[in-house]
């Protein structure tokens, strides 16, 4: 673990901590965008398929990503390669009311907008103008909820039902499964995805790309952890992939004067867009689409 962190020191010395974490976000984002575009990874499609009871392989693609991310993350923790106990999602006080209300709003918006935030970004990168406009509205609304006009409402809702940080937010501790149980949980669902993928004849890039997306989730945990261990001047948060906060941060970077501090999130969003664009370019899938039939 210490050796891995030491290997990052030459890069940190050369470009600095801020650029190192931003470049890490860019590289991971690029690979995520490429794999997400090739696999057609989309939570909305998986939810619709599940609700309709159809078997088109979209839920299986999502399951490949989910199980791979869980399995690899737990394996890295068990191997002693990383420790995510200091991650914001576990350390800070949590809001169950915020998760439920926000989750319901996110799910409804995902269906109405025809894609979650990551899918809208991927679609926009291949020329879908509807997805681009929807993504911009999403980013503006996210920024308003984080620190703008909607933030008092968000804070009020999040205060309805809260839980302490630490073990009170760790499902593996609450259930008593531990990281070994988490590893087995991921392995069982990955095995299920393999069986369903074979039965549904999921194409190569469907399952391979979905696994690649899952690997990027675990890679983000690992890389941010290692850089946080090697950094001296900056406090680097341990995190994985999300798109609500990063979308808002990227929007503010564009609108704010030059000289804003860089971070993982600000490399992630353009990286995803570039990765999806390259995938669409290589497979000749670039196409301008509007609202009519888009």
PLM regions: where:
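Membrane-interfacial helix-loop segments of redox and metal-homeostasis proteins
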Residues: 1-294
């Amino acid at each position: 673990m210490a050796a891995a962190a030491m290997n990052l020191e030459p890069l940190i010395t050369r470009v600095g901590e801020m650029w190192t974490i931003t470049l890490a976000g860019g590289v991971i984002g690029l690979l995520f965008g490429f794999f997400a575009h090739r696999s057609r990874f989309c939570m909305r499609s998986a939810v619709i398929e599940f609700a309709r009871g159809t078997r088109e392989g979209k839920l299986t693609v999502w399951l490949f990503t989910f199980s791979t991310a869980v399995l690899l993350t737990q394996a890295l923790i068990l191997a002693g390669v990383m420790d995510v106990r200091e991650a914001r999602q576990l350390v800070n006080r949590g809001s169950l009311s915020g998760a439920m209300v926000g989750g319901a709003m996110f799910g409804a918006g995902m269906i109405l907008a025809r894609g979650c935030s990551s899918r809208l970004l991927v679609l926009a990168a291949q020329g879908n103008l509807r997805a681009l406009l929807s993504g911009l509205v999403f980013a503006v609304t996210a920024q308003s909820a984080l620190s703008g006009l909607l933030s008092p409402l968000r804070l009020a809702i999040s205060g309805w039902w809260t839980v302490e940080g630490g073990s009170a937010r760790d499902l593996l501790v609450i259930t008593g499964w531990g990281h070994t149980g988490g590893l087995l949980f991921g392995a069982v669902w990955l095995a299920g995805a393999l069986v369903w993928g074979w039965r549904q004849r999921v194409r190569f890039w469907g399952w391979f790309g979905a696994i690649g997306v899952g690997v990027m989730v675990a890679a983000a945990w690992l890389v941010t952890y290692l850089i946080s261990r090697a950094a001296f001047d900056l406090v680097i948060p341990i995190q994985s992939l999300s798109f609500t906060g990063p979308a808002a941060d990227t929007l503010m970077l564009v609108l704010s004067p030059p000289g804003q501090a860089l971070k993982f999130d600000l490399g992630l969003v353009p990286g995803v867009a570039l990765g999806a664009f390259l995938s669409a370019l290589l497979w000749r899938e670039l196409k301008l689409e509007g609202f009519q039939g888009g």
